[in-house]
């Protein structure tokens, strides 16, 4: 197979070669942002539907105890981005729907400063994404149904002083700061 598209194909110079997100063993090819962890799971079918693990004691990506579990939904075509926590780690799992989840490392002292990691997650291709503090993260529902995301943050939500910072995904500041478009 050649590495170039023949020049006889109209638009050949605009084409970019696709790179698989996984290698031949199924391992992720992407270089993860420092501190970001991902564990893919799989739905196991049975006669009444299917079952899949969301989190389990002993998984090395779950260093801290679960102190709160909540779910949030996102309507088709809608965004939940960009969020950041100063102290808390998010542990995100897509229980229903189809999401494009992105994480941006804006930490200037990080070895992966400027990196973006992107994941396509769904109930058919589930995974637990652990987002440490000080990383911008968010998602877009790219499916046709309402998506359900389960979060198991390392710190319970503080109603009086939430550790939640928002940079609207469609703001001029986000467009200038984060090199990613949903």
Residue ranges and their predicted role:
Residues 129, 137-142:
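Short beta-strand His + acidic residue motifs that chelate non-heme Fe in jelly-roll/DSBH
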Residues 2-124, 142-182:
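Non-catalytic, conserved peripheral segments adjacent to functional cores
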């Amino acid at each position: 197979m050649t590495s170039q598209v023949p020049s006889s194909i109209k638009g050949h110079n605009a084409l970019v070669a696709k790179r698989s997100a996984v290698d031949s063993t199924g391992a992720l090819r992407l270089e993860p942002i420092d501190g970001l962890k991902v564990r893919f799971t799989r739905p196991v079918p049975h006669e009444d539907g299917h079952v899949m693990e969301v989190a389990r004691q002993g998984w090395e990506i779950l260093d801290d105890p679960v102190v709160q579990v909540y779910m949030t939904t996102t309507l088709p075509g809608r965004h939940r981005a960009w969020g950041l926590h100063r102290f808390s780690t998010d542990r995100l799992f897509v229980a229903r729907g189809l999401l494009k989840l992105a994480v941006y490392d804006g930490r200037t002292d990080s070895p992966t400063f400027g990196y973006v990691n992107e994941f396509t997650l769904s109930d058919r291709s589930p995974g637990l994404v652990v987002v440490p503090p000080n990383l911008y993260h968010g998602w877009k529902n790219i499916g046709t149904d309402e998506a359900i995301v389960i979060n198991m943050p390392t710190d319970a939500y503080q109603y009086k002083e939430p550790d939640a910072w928002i940079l609207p995904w469609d703001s001029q500041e986000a467009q200038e700061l984060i090199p990613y478009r949903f």
